[in-house]
């Protein structure tokens, strides 16, 4: 939609029909702002997506240890109460695709199989297989990879190498239930459709996200080894964890959880792609970097980067940077520095949740609200001193100094997340998997 607004007609290649299943999503405050900027705020209200006023985080005793409200940062630096939405992704994604095509985007039902690479090494489009098994070549001056964790271009080795991150041995087990008891108070923290996060120990937590007026998405994120040790079927595992993980969670489910679908399992590993934009291509969102889903940044990052990529793409198509090895330098640097802020916040939470809670409640409340809202990119047009102070505090807590390589293109991930001697992760078996969703689906 951003490209269309800027006078460019994109061709969207979709391998699977819509609507299609996707895990439910909690939007950040800035994600809601992007939808309003696209003129879709009224549409979101008309459709009836649950309204999110913020996030309640529960400590090990089951108490609401801290509350993060959705707040809008105004140009003068002040904050204003705002709201965003929870969405059932199958419905939301279908709405966004319909909106894009109604505004002028073209859509092709096909499966991209390989990038087209010119003699000079520049990507010039993709080879695709249509639903009637015809192989076609689609040439384009610019290819945008928006395939999410399937990482089409990285897995085809068209980018720099793809490295595993810190959260490379976790999985999420999730489903939907109809008997999660919601709040119904007057305060914003007690509104019925807020997000709830339940913590029990490092890398072991649960979510509850209302996705309509009856159904709540619930899920457990745990180390994969813990899941294997239990030796339980997915649904049995999830049922027990909903009862055992945190008293704040079990206290909101009357009796046994009433599942409205079966349980699902997906890998939850983090990764980082080097050189994720170059001559003829750009990677957007999870297709080049993924950290941890605990604070629901994924959808916002995808939409935010899409806007930044659209601006850079228009300049490139007009000739700016064409013929150079590094036409998207500013895009990559801006994105890397923003995602670094996410990584530092998430790592601080996991490494020292008590100190994190104290910092967010007392010294750096507004700065943490900025980060959790999604204001970690540097183009908000309002003061970000409080955000930067919070980020500096998280890095100090971690004993971390952020450094960048000599070209200024990439952050250098810290500690165990990056070893020069470690071979890059190439998920080169992607061709043998029927669909993106199948790749993300059940492990057993």
Regions found by a protein language model. Give the residues of each.
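Glycine-rich FAD pyrophosphate-binding loop
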Residues: 4-23
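N-terminal FAD cofactor-binding segment of flavoenzymes
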Residues: 20-64
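Helix-loop-beta segment of a Rossmann-like dinucleotide-binding subdomain
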Residues: 65-87, 125, 221-225
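Mobile, glycine/GP-rich and aromatic-enriched active-site lid/loop segments adjacent to catalytic centers
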Residues: 67, 199-203, 209-273, 278-279, ...
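Short beta-strand to alpha-helix junction loop
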Residues: 76-98, 228-233
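Predominantly flavin-linked oxidoreductase catalytic cores and closely associated redox partners
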Residues: 99-249
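FAD/FMN-dependent oxidoreductases across multiple families
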Residues: 226-312, 316-338
């Amino acid at each position: 939609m951003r490209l269309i607004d800027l006078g460019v007609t994109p061709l969207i290649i979709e391998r699977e029909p819509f609507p299609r299943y996707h895990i439910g999503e909690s939007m950040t405050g800035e994600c809601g702002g992007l939808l309003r900027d696209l003129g879709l705020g009224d549409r979101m209200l008309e459709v009836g997506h649950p309204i999110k006023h913020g996030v309640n985080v529960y400590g090990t005793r089951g108490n609401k240890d801290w509350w993060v409200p959705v707040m809008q940062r105004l140009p003068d630096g002040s904050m204003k109460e705002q709201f965003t939405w929870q969405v059932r992704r199958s419905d939301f994604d279908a709405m966004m695709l319909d909106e894009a095509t109604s505004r002028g985007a073209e859509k092709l039902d096909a499966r991209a199989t390989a990038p087209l690479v010119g003699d000079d090494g520049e990507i010039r489009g993709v080879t695709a297989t249509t639903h009637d098994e015809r192989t076609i070549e689609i040439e384009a001056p610019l290819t945008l990879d928006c395939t999410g964790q399937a990482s089409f271009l990285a897995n085809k080795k068209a980018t720099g190498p793809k490295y595993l991150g810190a959260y490379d041995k976790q999985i999420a087990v999730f489903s939907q239930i109809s008997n999660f008891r919601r709040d119904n108070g007057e305060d914003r923290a007690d509104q019925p459709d807020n997000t709830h996060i339940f913590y029990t120990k490092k890398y072991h937590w649960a979510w509850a996200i209302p996705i309509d007026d009856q159904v709540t998405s619930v899920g457990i994120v745990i180390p994969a080894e813990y899941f294997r040790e239990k030796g339980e079927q997915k649904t049995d595992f999830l049922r027990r964890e909903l009862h055992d993980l945190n008293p704040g969670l079990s206290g909101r489910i009357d009796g046994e959880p009433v599942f409205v679908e079966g349980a699902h399992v997906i890998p939850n590993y983090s990764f980082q792609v080097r050189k994720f934009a170059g001559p003829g291509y750009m990677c957007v969102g999870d297709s080049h970097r993924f950290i941890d889903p605990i604070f629901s940044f994924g959808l916002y990052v995808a939409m935010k980067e899409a806007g930044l990529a659209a601006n850079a793409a228009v300049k490139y198509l007009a000739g700016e940077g064409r013929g150079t090895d590094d036409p998207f330098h500013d895009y990559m640097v801006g994105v890397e520095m923003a995602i670094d802020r996410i990584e530092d916040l998430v790592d601080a939470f996991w490494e020292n949740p008590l100190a994190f809670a104290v910092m967010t409640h007392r010294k750096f409340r507004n700065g943490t609200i900025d980060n959790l809202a999604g204001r970690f990119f540097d183009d908000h047009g309002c003061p970000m001193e409080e955000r930067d102070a919070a980020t500096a505090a998280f890095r100090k807590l971690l004993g971390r100094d952020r450094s960048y390589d000599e070209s200024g293109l990439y952050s250098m991930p810290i500690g165990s997340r990056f070893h020069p001697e470690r071979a890059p992760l190439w998920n080169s078996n992607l061709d043998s998997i029927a669909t993106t969703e199948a790749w993300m689906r059940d492990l057993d």
